[in-house]
Amino acid sequence: MRYSISVGIGFFLLACAQQSVPQGSTPVKPVNCPGVSSPDQQLRACILSVGKHPNPPFNESRVEIRNMAGSVLATKDFKSPDGEHGRNVQKNEWSSDSQFFVFSTASSGGHSPWHWQTYLYDRKQKTFKEVDDFTGPVIKRNFKLSPPDWIQVQVQGTATDPTDINIGHPEKRRLSTLH
């Protein structure tokens, strides 16, 4: 009788050990990188410091868009060979609909301190775009996002002085229309 019970338990344990774990049942670890997650918690924009200067204001940045499993979907690298001609991320924010990640940058070497090149990651097109290409040169780092996907930036020029880089004028665009 003991032998039968032992054999039965042995077969039971063997059967349990042979069962496969269904895919997707293991909880995904949160993506661990400096940055910000999208409002829908499906993507994370990682802001990594690269180059010879590890800390602001002279560091250079790499932006990686990752899914929550940690896979890199897109990368925008601002590292320069000499560490003084790249860019670093200053302000960054997701649009409320989670379709766009927007960030402003400054020169790592202090060149053109008036020009805050601003970029976006377009989730549907899986690509980065420069906002300046659609608005003109951005002269203030603090862009404003409003639902669902509007951006307002301050750009070069006034009605009386098209070369002005101190005051400029506001430009508002819908991110989903920038092609």
Model-based region annotation:
Residues M1-S4:
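Positively charged n-region of N-terminal signal peptides that target proteins for export
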Residues P39-D40, S96-D97:
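Residue-level detector of Asp-centered blade-edge/turn motifs that repeat once per structural unit
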Residues P54-N59, G110-H115, I165-G168:
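Short, solvent-exposed loop/turn segments at conserved positions within beta-propeller repeat blades
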Residues F58-T75:
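Beta-propeller domains
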Residues L73-G83, T127-D132:
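A short beta-strand motif characteristic of beta-propeller blades
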Residues P81-N88, V138-R141:
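Short glycine-/Asp-/Thr-/Trp-enriched loop segments that recur within the blades
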